[in-house]
Curated annotation (Swiss-Prot):
This is Fructose-1,6-bisphosphatase class 3. It is an enzyme of class 3 (hydrolase). Its EC number is 3.1.3.11. It comes from Clostridium botulinum (strain 657 / Type Ba4). The lineage of its organism: Bacteria, Bacillati, Bacillota, Clostridia, Eubacteriales. GO terms for molecular function: fructose 1,6-bisphosphate 1-phosphatase activity. Pathway: Carbohydrate biosynthesis; gluconeogenesis. Keywords: Carbohydrate metabolism, Hydrolase, Manganese.
Amino acid sequence: MTLYDENNLHIIKDNLRYLKLLSKQYPSISSASSEIINLQAILNLPKGTEHFISDVHGEYESFTHMLKNASGVIKRKIDDVFGTSLRECDKKNLATLIYYPEQKLDLIKKSEKNLEDWYKITLYRLIRLCQIVSSKYTRSKVRKSLPSDFAYIIEELLNEQGDRVDKQEYYNSIIETIIDIDRASEFIIAISNVIQRLVVDKLHIIGDIYDRGPGAEIIIEALSKHHSIDIQWGNHDIVWMGAAAGCEACIANVIRISLRYANLSTLEDGYGINLLPLATFAMDFYKEDNCENFKPRTIDKNLNETDIKLLSKMHKAISIIQFKLEGKIIKRRPEFKMEERLLLDKINIKEGTLNLNEKIYKLIDTNFPTLDKENPYELNERERDLVEKLTNSFINSEKLQRHIKFLYSNGSLYLKYNSNLLYHGCIPLNDDGSLKEVTLCKETLKGKSLLDKLDRLAREAYFFKKDPESKLYGMDMMWYLWCGPNSPLFGKKKMTTFERYFLDDKNTHKEEKNPYYKYRNNEKMCTMIFEEFELDADNSHIINGHIPVKTKEGENPIKANGKLLVIDGGFCKAYQPQTGIAGYTLIYNSYGLLLTSHEPFSSIHKAIVEGNDILSSTTILEHVSSRKRVLDTDSGEEIKKQIHDLEMLLVAYRKGLIKEENEANIRF
């Protein structure tokens, strides 16, 4: 070895304790050398494909399909492999089979006249496609992706060339045997799932899994089974995380939003949250109130008048409770500087008015049966009892707690990954574009240090159960992250929920965005953020969600000359009339960056029966002349460190600083 000679042998001696531990795993020169060769080979493989999705908002059907088709990657692979040798309808059917193998096979078995021939043709096609998508990985990594039932057979087929004369008979006999013993369906399902798994090496979810859609819990259940995933929390995720931690204000917000969009399936069916106490409370206190301004906003939901009336009453009841609970946090935490959101004490019930910023506004709803004008932020006895019951439901929901732990273990406020900076909302800025300083826990923080601190506090809210004071502060901070003026997730000066319910004047409904959004198209701002997060400004991108891109109005998701990319997924149906599309996703493969825009998705049923896919158009943002390799990634940096350590171990063996283990002992 030339890396370590007599002049720098002290480096090895300084690391001798660690190297002795490493020698337990690689007990000989032979085993250490083999591992170096293996790792060096991995460095030269093409970089794995990354898939970026944002702002799912509980729309599980669209998301499930996007996950299965990898934003069009599978279709592009089919085109690459089969080109003009397959008709478009055959390509479409093959793609649908890979996305939904079980359901598609059920249909094919009913319609296909010569099923054995179809099996044979399809198996050849799937194996060929799988050979291509697995070619950028080591055999070891591919092997780990294979289902145990078919692992050996799939590995044999992937590594044999069916066009070689001496192997063709062997290759054909395997496929014929699979069909003869009636295992073709199971094999097709298995290899389709392998293709889905291998086509994307890393999945990034840039926030807002939760919100108004009906299936957030279905989405998280699917994500928890994904082989490699990270999540950057969104504002809607953080409010659910706060609710699961026991933050009463977050619980009230979660329930209010669910009632606002008549989406109770996630709460009741998904997580078993009992809303009957709230319904009883609402009927008792708002029986004669039509709660006109609290009628749920329904899209594609057929609700009868009785349901609408009940949901409206529940909606108003929890909203008033929310304002009371939020008032307590604001008073408890003067450092949040949110006193202007204390509005209940500004209500004149007798006059039916609100004093907002020294201006008097007429209230459009003056029925406040639970409001004590002397102590407007105090819960009455019935409200306190209700809040305790709801909190117990959230804390004791096994599935909710499991899902939130998954968000904590796989998530963070931001992520640096392969020279890209991923975050959901914004980096708080001043009006002049400089980083905004925020004081928390007697510390003045900005930029990266602010996000790091907020990330730690969010974890304390959930995990510091034996430290009530720290846990309470963390829970209050979770609520602040949801709606606070300097929250990197919210990104606005204030949340005007009260004004939207109780005031007609639309000017009071406005929510001023953080200056970050004014500077998003500014390359200097992006460079400043890259420097703050210790990234190379020439080779990095900010990948952002949160604010839907209004493509319909000509807005471009590519900001600051390609340095900042906004990929709000547009899954939320309510935003699609404004955006004109169903949003964007991003693919980062060994050839570069691909931004894909998507049309609205019809349904999984139509995708299976009619072969309907999400219509997408792809823009090549960056294309490299030589493919990026594992060498160029964060994983590559880690592998280089491993190689460095193993090289030190080799020198330690050769210099006699560590003794090799006897070959016989190694084997037996």
